[in-house]
Amino acid sequence: MSEDALASKRRADEEGSAEGSAPGKDDRAPSKRPRNTTSTTTGIPTVSGVVSSLGTNRVSSGSPTSSSAAAGAGGGPRTIVTFNLNGGGPRLTNNWEELAAFLEENTADLVCFQEFRLPAKGVPKCKKDDDTGRKRGQLKDDTAADRKDIALLQKTLMKLARRLGYRVLMSLANYKYAGTAVLIRCDDTPDGRGVRADTCPAVDVFYNITEDGELVKKHDREGRVIAIEYPSMTVVMLYVPNNGVKPESFKRREQWDSVLRGFVNGYVKRTGRTLVITGDLNVAHTDADLTHPSYFKGMFPAATPRNSGQPGCTPAEKERHSLLLESGGGLVDAYRHLHPVAAAAAGGSAGTNTEGITWRGTAGNQVAASGRYYGKGMRIDYFLVSKSLAARIKEVKVFGRGADREGFLGSDHSPLMLTLLPSS
């Protein structure tokens, strides 16, 4: 068995996911976080001081006129990229040149990464199940391997972010698992490029959600949430846990989905703000979002039919996603808004549905076609927007395509970019 195959098997054993390279590769959901809505002054987390602390958990340019000027131009990002890296370390090591070229060519106002998979700082020699003293916005730094990860991040993503005018914020798990990061475009860039006229600095950043509609500063234990409040909209980036194949993982995912629906309903009711929810939501809503519907639906029979099938396309997950779209006055799947499901695609015979697929299976070691999921894929990465934003959806670009994952930049997920028209 190859080193890659061993690593894949080890992750599956540790995380309880379905055998093989299945989307998401985990079935854990975080425990419900306690409410904590008090403002903090702990400073934005840094990586060895590379990103300067801004004094509070606010991201701003320091210009007293920037927010008001931006609000006049819409008060929020017009271009957002979401990308499940399938490991920050591997992408920064093996695919940095193509990832850097992608970020330079597509200078989005906000870039959202999932599966960043770098460990959070804790007390010296802490074990992976030890939450003591965890600083989830900073990298673990007490071993030579940790310091190597920090050096890698500094010379790649952090260096590029400074040049392009981004702040880098992270939310990390205890070990190389899950985790998220964002690049937020600001207007105090070293090279004077400045923020574009159609965007603005973020107002505030949060790291978890509650079922009653609150954004909170305390990080999700597995680093699955980063939410950014702009003057006129809130962007919530999520890495949703995989449904798994065991009853306990079904229950955890059901709880996660319930909390998310509660958050959307409560937040919109309380604030009236426009929402964009993006990231790896780990669900293919309809058969049109699967390359091989019959194959996926025939996988992993469960005691309850509602939980039978490949994680990501079980009846229970699809039903809950439909309920999410009805939450908060209604959310619009931006890709499907522009690309409605054709009647012919609804049945979804094998290999028929290929457009918009965001996750693709891995090729076999010796023969590509021997890979369990090779040639198969799902659309599980999304931009869900409030109905009031639907008229502004200009484009949702899925950069990757095909069984051989062209444009996937080394990941098993494709990057996506949402472009919004200017507000009237």
Show which residues each predicted segment covers.
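Short catalytic/ligand-binding loop motif for oxyanion handling, primarily in non-cytosolic enzymes
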Residues: 89-90, 119-123, 177-180, 191, ...
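Metal-dependent phosphoester-hydrolase catalytic domains
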Residues: 4-6, 10-16, 25-26, 30-37, ...
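Surface-exposed cleft-lining segments at the edges of enzyme active sites
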Residues: 207-216, 240-257, 261-264, 307-309
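N-terminal, active-site-proximal structural segment of metallo-dependent hydrolase catalytic domains
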Residues: 2-160, 167-180, 412, 423-424
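Structured beta-strand-rich core segments of catalytic domains in phosphoester-bond hydrolases
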Residues: 117, 122-245
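Catalytic-core regions built around general acid/base machinery
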Residues: 102, 156-163, 259-267, 320-324
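Active-site beta-strand/loop signature of hydrolases that rely on acidic residues for catalysis
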Residues: 80-85, 102-124, 235, 264-288, ...
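Short amphipathic alpha-helical segment that frequently serves as the phosphate-/nucleotide-binding helix
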Residues: 93-100, 253-261, 415
